[in-house]
Amino acid sequence: MKKILVVGDLIADYYLWGKSERLSPEAPVPVLEVKKESKNLGGAANVANNLISLKAKVFLCGVVGDDLEGKHFISALKARNIDTSGILTDKTRCTTLKTRIIAQNQQIARVDKEIKDPLNADLRKNLLDFITEKIQEIDGVILSDYNKGVLDFELTQTIITLANKHHKLILCDPKGKDYSKYSHASLITPNRFELEHALHLKLDSHASLSKALQILKETYQIAMPLVTLSEQGIAFLEQGELVNCPTIAKEVYDVTGAGDTVIASLTLSLLESMSLKDACEFANAAAAVVVGKMGSALASLEEIALILNQTHPKILPLEKLLETLEHNQQKIVFTNGCFDLLHKGHASYLQKAKALGDILIVGLNSDASVKRLKGDKRPIVSEKDRAFLLASLSCVDYVVVFEEDTPIQLIQALKPDILVKGADYLNKEVIGSEFAKETRLMEFGEGYSTSAIIEKIKRTCND
């Protein structure tokens, strides 16, 4: 588990949800009939929350006011297992609170309560003492700057210098015009508007984007400069050349907090030794998850994997499949296998299995599972491609990949009406049969097997 220190501005996000169908008689403004209220962790706390969702250990460092919102805020952080020992109380300010008013799932107004004054000398010293104490323990640092007074120029540069001295990855989500504040950071994540504002450049072409990123690299010594481009994805430099990693999002409901998700997922990806390109693809997938939800949403590893791996709508993780089948009344048939080098025998077997019920679910052994069962030279075809081929068959309704050696957990969760296995299981125990109403054995098709196909290919190559 990676340990990440997040330093920055803490924001309480408050939402009023409802419907608006009339104007106020007092002024030409809409009247919201509130149906629901919710509170989320915002700013640097949302970055921390995203990291928790991605299975990291998080130390959060920032400031709240000496007020009820601040107390509730810290309680919410603790409930998410975020370490709050680096959060200080400032008696001279209120906890930053952003209230968003949502009507018919559209944000119609926002009300901000905040004080953006710089921290006093004592608070700055206490924050820096905490960071200095933690720096050797953690794997990376994120500076989440919302320009609310915590990350002034001097403190930001001191933290970056400290991180570099201890060879720690340090990423910054910047604000304001002066990017010298973030000089020598490992990576910064401005959006197009922020970067245009800071560099006084219009970023409307390949050449202008490349020039802007070169300035970040050469003038500000940012090791890995990039820019987020909303629906156009993320652009970065690779050996001096501009690379664009396109967005993955299909439906956008709310972009609130998407930048926090991007920097959190980039940090963890890079700490896992991913290339910058792969890290950007991972971050794009995480962002695609959160913009498809309302509010400062989170992306789980399972949801990100679904975005990255799903090349067919029939391919689902178990959690999503169970959700899809929650109110199902049709007869479910389940079978499983490696289905390496899909052949006529497989297709015939699956068609017969589907004929036994209404919905056919195929449990597919992952690459790691196949390797354990059949040896290091298998599978021939990757799990992603095997899943796609199976999902392309009209007789198959859903494909779910499992990592274990057996599908016992899938069968126990799905509780199919009929469990189908190959006829070679005659007089053998069928794993998971106790969780199905009925177990049926079925021929694959005489003369067809993946092993036979592999041997035939070998003989042909040798000839």
UniProtKB/Swiss-Prot annotation:
Pfam families, per database record: CTP_transf_like, PfkB
Self-association and partners: Homodimer.
InterPro entries cross-referenced by the UniProt entry: Bifunc_HldE, Cyt_trans-like, PfkB_dom, RfaE_dom_I, RfaE_dom_II, Ribokinase-like, Rossmann-like_a/b/a_fold
GO CC term (a single one): cytosol
Active-site residues, Swiss-Prot/TrEMBL: 260
Gene: hldE
Region (Ribokinase): 1-311
EC class (word): transferase
Keyword annotations from UniProtKB, A to Z: ATP-binding, Carbohydrate metabolism, Kinase, Multifunctional enzyme, Nucleotide-binding, Nucleotidyltransferase, Transferase
Entry EC no(s): 2.7.1.167, 2.7.7.70
Catalytic activity: D-glycero-beta-D-manno-heptose 7-phosphate + ATP = D-glycero-beta-D-manno-heptose 1,7-bisphosphate + ADP + H(+); D-glycero-beta-D-manno-heptose 1-phosphate + ATP + H(+) = ADP-D-glycero-beta-D-manno-heptose + diphosphate
Its job: Catalyzes the ADP transfer from ATP to D-glycero-beta-D-manno-heptose 1-phosphate, yielding ADP-D-glycero-beta-D-manno-heptose.
Family membership noted in the UniProt record: In the N-terminal section; belongs to the carbohydrate kinase PfkB family. In the C-terminal section; belongs to the cytidylyltransferase family.
Binding sites annotated in the UniProt record for ATP: 191-194
Protein name: Bifunctional protein HldE
Source superkingdom: Bacteria
HAMAP family assigned: HldE (MF_01603)
UniProt pathway: Nucleotide-sugar biosynthesis; ADP-L-glycero-beta-D-manno-heptose biosynthesis; ADP-L-glycero-beta-D-manno-heptose from D-glycero-beta-D-manno-heptose 7-phosphate: step 1/4; Nucleotide-sugar biosynthesis; ADP-L-glycero-beta-D-manno-heptose biosynthesis; ADP-L-glycero-beta-D-manno-heptose from D-glycero-beta-D-manno-heptose 7-phosphate: step 3/4
NCBIfam families: cyt_tran_rel, rfaE_dom_I, rfaE_dom_II
GO biological process terms on file: ADP-L-glycero-beta-D-manno-heptose biosynthetic process
